[in-house]
Amino acid sequence: MASGDVLPRFYTVFLSCVSSNSLLIPRSYYEHLPRRLPKTAILTGTGGRVWKVAMMSKREQVYLARGWENFVADNELKDGEFLTFVFDGYKSYEVSIYGRGSCKETRAVVHVEEISDESESDNDSLGSLVDVTPMPAEENSDDTEGDNDSCDSVVDVTPMPVEEISDASDSDYY
């Protein structure tokens, strides 16, 4: 995509009775894309977590399939929540979740803690280790009571690298 292009996007309302195991991608969205959709997509949530999800074509419709149920569980999606998907033009979607109160929510946050070893010498060239652990959703609410600005324990994590489109074969796309 050219740098001035607007990234393709769509939205949906989550309903567990139809979207817990797979999510139908609107035909009006994918029919107008300049490229075919990949068979595997990378979903990046607002909390920094990343999910690999299979895209499946069935009866001339495209779904987010295998792996979608992990996204649903990790983000504790509830009926009536609004999801937006912004496609990078290759394989990745940035997914935002809007709760029933119409506000964007941060879920499935990646929690980073620095682990120091007391026995390490100050001259140790390896430095300290970092533990990256997902935080449970109830610990990462956007509650502003008390205005606790301790942002040092939660950080954005760069999404995992995705192979370039030029490296993909035609069988990787619909």
From Swiss-Prot:
Subcellular locations according to the entry: Nucleus
Keyword hit for DNA-binding: yes
Biased composition (Acidic residues): 139-150, 164-174
Gene3D superfamilies to which the protein is assigned, alphabetical: DNA-binding pseudobarrel domain
Domain of life (superkingdom): Eukaryota
DNA-binding region: 8-101
Cited SMART domains: B3
CC annotations in GO: nucleus
Pfam families found in the cross-reference section: B3
Chain segments carrying region Disordered: 114-174
GO molecular function: DNA binding
Keywords: DNA-binding, Nucleus, Transcription, Transcription regulation
Chain segments annotated as transmembrane: none
The keyword Transcription is assigned to this record: yes
CDD domains recorded: B3_DNA
SUPFAM superfamilies hit by this protein: DNA-binding pseudobarrel domain
InterPro entries: B3_DNA-bd, DNA-bd_pseudobarrel_sf, Plant_B3_domain
Record-linked PANTHER family: B3 DOMAIN-CONTAINING, B3 DOMAIN-CONTAINING PROTEIN REM21
Protein name, per record: B3 domain-containing protein At3g06220
Species whose genome carries this gene: Arabidopsis thaliana
